[in-house]
Amino acid sequence: MTQSIDQLHLLILNVGLAIHNADWNWKNVSSPFTRLYYIMEGTAQIIFPDGMQELKPHHLYLVPSFTTHSYQCNSHFTHYYLHIYEDHQSESGILEDWNFPIEIPAGNLELPLIKRLCEINPTMQLPQSDPTSYDNNPTLIRNIIKNKQRTFCDKVESRGIVYQLIARFLKDAKPKVEVNDNRIQKVLSHIRKNIYKTVDIDSLAAISCLSKDHFIRLFKKEVGTTPLQYINQKKIEKAQLILITEDIPVKNIGIGRAHV
């Protein structure tokens, strides 16, 4: 992993302890933030499109942003939850660009860390567990503002704890796209820096010092899709994120599409 830690900009939206008795059952949840769980006792399941994940005590679980999933709980179940939002103004999204393990066993440090995170962020507990009560535009904006209004010392300590928890998953994470060619890496960096602008394929070919046809073939070989498809998909993802997390009318979200 060659990314700089300066590229990782994480904000805490919610953190707390949840106690359920067969009432943690929600369907077709999909959010612009990442969910991290530490299971204390009991069992439950998270149902993904490609299968079901059993939640076990003393294990950590990570649910990536924009991943459609459902929850199923038929008995007593206690867990800590942490909702993390990766600042979309960052040049790149590490949580977005990497595949993380869904489940890892907990060590001796994770529980004290997440308990401390709850202790210094008491106002970030969820009033109720129903995702529709907190996974909406006004609530997300309030939570982001609340995060930024905390004391500086709490921000520093909280960020350090979140980094330690995410680091456990980063250890076995793999990039969604493994790019080995430096020319394509430069192009991807340029696309991310200019995602809100109109991106011209000819200019990308010039950055790679290749002819347009050669560039398109090499890009598809390295990334697995054409430059045009990649750029437009990234623009759609960014637009969806802004729509959900910013109080901006749809007509004002003008993200130019790529041009051949």
Map each language-model feature to its residues.
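Short, Lys/Arg-enriched N-terminal segment that forms or immediately precedes the first helix
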Residues: 22, 171-174, 211, 223
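Short hydrophobic/aromatic patches on the structural cores and recognition surfaces of FHA
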Residues: 42, 58-59, 82, 215, ...
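Generic protein-terminus/edge-of-domain signal
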Residues: 1-59, 66-69, 73-76, 91, ...
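Terminal helix-turn-helix DNA-binding modules in bacterial transcription factors
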Residues: 185-205, 210, 217-259
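An amphipathic alpha-helical interaction segment
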Residues: 106-179
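Short, flexible helix-adjacent loops and helix caps
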Residues: 51, 126, 174-177, 195-196, ...
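A short hydrophobic beta-strand segment most commonly corresponding to one strand
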Residues: 62, 76-93
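C-terminal/domain-terminus segments
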Residues: 173, 178-191
